[in-house]
Design a protein with these regions (language model features):
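Substrate-binding pocket helix/loop in short-chain dehydrogenase/reductase
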Residues: 96-97, 104-106
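The beta1-alpha1 cofactor-binding region of Rossmann-like NAD(H)/NADP(H)-dependent oxidoreductases
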Residues: 59-70, 102
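Conserved glycine-rich Rossmann-like NAD(P)H-binding loop of the short-chain dehydrogenase/reductase
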Residues: 27-43
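Conserved glycine-rich cofactor-binding loop
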Residues: 13-15
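Residue(s) in the substrate-gating loop at a strand-loop-helix junction
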Residues: 140
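Active-site helix of classical SDR
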Residues: 120, 156
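SDR active-site lid
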Residues: 170-243
């Protein structure tokens, strides 16, 4: 795929989405860079300007049925096509299940899972009529390995993995290729992480294990990948002649995901994650 493509990317106000928008635009693609709030587009505009490229920056809230549908319709009306979708928008909600409300779980699911569903609903009719689309979702090692104090986030990423693994062979019947990209720790602020341990009681029943897990997380982020590294892989996946279903972004993530698929009883994974707290 060497000709200019029309690439829609969600969650572009920061992090992986911002880096991906700059990368794809720098490679000559027509990028539609979307986010929930255009007031947060400053960093993206700066990144594009520094790279000497441009993008069509638009509002798109993937947690909203009507807004997502109308937003995609507008993109198709203005650009005529969407060749690649990078489903990147996501939120992280820290905490263990007892501490989190049902609304916390619902919010995570609405964006991280149903956001992808809404995007598929918007582009699949077009792709069936004109085969060749690519749907690439930013998942996580958390879609394979359940992690303490990440219950809602892991739930949503497990669900995303199941959704797209189920959808991929059906989509392929219409020439549509589906891939999941699974990063581990990535440097920079996860700006959409709307709730975190700081909002939990510092002296509650989970304070000590949370503190131990936070230390493990801090250590992991000392060796984190960069947003640019993940953006490069996303571009490679979009350019691949025969993209795979799953891509791990580092050797560490490959080992962890490999452990999960080999561990039929789950005890080795449980032993590993138990040591984190």
């Amino acid at each position: 795929m060497t000709e200019m493509r029309t690439v829609l990317i969600t969650g572009c106000s920061s992090g992986i989405g911002l880096a991906a928008a700059v990368k794809f635009a720098s490679e000559g693609d027509m990028v539609i860079a979307t986010m929930r709030d255009l007031d947060r587009a400053g960093a993206l505009r700066e990144g594009l300007a520094e790279a000497g490229v441009s993008a069509d920056i638009r509002v798109l809230d993937v947690s909203d049925d009507v807004g997502t549908a109308s937003g995609l319709e507008a993109v198709l009306a203005d650009h005529g096509r969407i060749d690649v979708v990078i489903s990147n928008a996501g939120i992280g909600i820290d905490g263990t299940t007892e501490e989190l409300s049902v609304d916390d779980f619902r919010a995570s699911f609405e964006t991280n899972v149903l956001g992808a569903v809404r995007l598929i609903h918007g582009v699949m009719p077009v792709w069936r009529a004109h085969p060749g689309g690519r749907f690439i979702a930013v998942s996580s090692v958390s879609g394979a390995i359940g992690q303490p104090f990440n219950d809602a986030y892991c739930m949503s990423k497990f669900a995303l993995e199941g959704l797209l693994e189920s959808f991929a062979p059906v989509a392929a019947q219409f020439g549509v290729q589906v891939s999941l990209v699974e990063p581990g720790p990535v440097s920079g602020v996860f700006v959409d992480k709307s709730r975190g341990p700081q909002q939990q009681s510092s002296d509650g029943p989970y304070a000590e294990p949370r503190g131990r897990f936070q230390a493990v997380q801090d250590s992991a982020f000392d060796a984190a990948q960069t947003n640019d590294e993940i953006a490069q892989l996303l571009w490679d996946v979009a350019a691949a002649d025969e993209p795979m279903l799953r891509y791990q972004t580092s050797e560490l993530v490959e080992k962890m995901v490999g452990l999960k698929f080999k561990d039929m009883s789950g005890q080795r994974v449980l032993g590993m994650t138990s040591r984190w707290i």
